[in-house]
């Protein structure tokens, strides 16, 4: 779901916001090490590795940034879409979103939930 304290769209001038929704509640990820010294061995680090659940728009933003980076790598670095720009990336992300029976776009989810696999699935020749 969407966090209670997340803002809702649309914008005052009726632009659709948010564009897409990304996971930001109960996302599993690594927790940063604290108090580690350079003398710590790799084994000690592995033994002390911790994962935890995190919440917040910063988590959703990081996941979205990683998704965009992978999409840009596919388009520009791997030469699949050399004309890729921010508008194209936005269109790709919207095209690949998951939509779950609600009216889209809407004030809570925008065009749907972020789904990088969905982007590539939509680009695949049918």
Where is each model-derived feature located?
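Substrate-binding/active-site groove segments that recognize
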Residues: 18, 114-115
């Amino acid at each position: 779901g969407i966090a209670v304290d997340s803002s809702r769209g649309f914008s005052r001038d009726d632009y659709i916001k948010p564009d897409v929704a990304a996971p930001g509640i109960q996302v599993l990820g690594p927790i940063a090490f604290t108090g580690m010294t350079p003398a710590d061995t790799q084994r000690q680090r592995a033994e002390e590795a911790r994962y935890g659940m995190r919440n917040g728009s910063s988590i959703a933003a990081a996941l979205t940034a990683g998704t965009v980076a992978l999409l840009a790598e596919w388009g520009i670095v791997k030469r699949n879409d050399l004309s890729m720009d921010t508008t194209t990336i936005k269109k790709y992300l919207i095209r690949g979103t998951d939509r779950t029976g609600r009216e889209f776009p809407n004030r809570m989810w925008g065009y749907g939930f972020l789904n990088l696999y969905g982007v590539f699935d939509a680009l695949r020749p049918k």
